[in-house]
């Protein structure tokens, strides 16, 4: 996992009471964890959708046109709608599709669910994402892991907009 504690000093040094932090790590619950590290700073939560690959040493290449940031205030953070919309405008002016979430806890869990199922399936079978699109044991594993995430989400009282397994399959089949 990520060592969030290691960034505390940097965040304290680089921010003040007017700073707004939007973590976009593929980790569920990042915003609240960072908020506890730097209580004097406003920390939201977020997730990013982008497709890319390591194309060289210290280099990442974006593939396709998917580049979307979903963000919002987690339960213990109060941020004005005006501030959230100002961030959205800045991101959109930079060419990033930005969405303000009405339930960032749900939306970051959904992203985590997809990434987790894909990463474990890919690592276990040593296959790229395209193999999950084909019927068989690789896809069945991805479905099983997505079902486990759905069960965990229900235990966490997360209300999904749609069935998380169907959603994950829709994403993988695009």
Model-derived regions, located:
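Rossmann-like NAD(P)(H) cofactor-binding subdomain of soluble oxidoreductases
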Residues: 1-59
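Internal alpha-helical scaffold of NAD(P)-dependent oxidoreductase catalytic cores
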Residues: 13-14, 37-42, 57-162
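Short, solvent-exposed loop/turn elements at beta->coil junctions and helix N-caps
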Residues: 50, 103-106, 170
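Short, intrinsically disordered, charge-balanced linker/junction segments flanking boundaries
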Residues: 166-174
């Amino acid at each position: 996992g990520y060592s969030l504690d290691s960034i505390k000093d940097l965040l304290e040094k680089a921010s003040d009471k007017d700073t707004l932090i939007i973590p976009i790590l593929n980790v569920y619950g990042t915003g609240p964890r960072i908020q506890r590290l730097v209580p004097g700073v406003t920390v939201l939560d977020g997730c990013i959708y982008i497709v890319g690959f390591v194309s060289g040493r210290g280099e990442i290449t974006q593939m396709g046109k998917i580049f979307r940031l979903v963000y919002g205030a987690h339960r213990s953070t109060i941020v004005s709608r005006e501030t959230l919309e100002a961030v959205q405008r800045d991101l959109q002016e930079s060419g990033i599709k930005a969405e303000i979430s009405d339930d960032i806890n749900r939306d970051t869990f959904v992203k985590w669910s997809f990434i987790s199922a894909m990463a474990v399936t890919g690592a276990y079978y040593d296959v790229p994402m395209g193999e999950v699109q084909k019927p068989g044991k690789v896809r069945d594993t991805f479905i099983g892991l997505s079902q486990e995430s759905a069960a965990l989400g229900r235990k966490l009282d997360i209300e999904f907009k749609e069935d998380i397994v169907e959603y994950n399959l829709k994403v993988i089949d695009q």
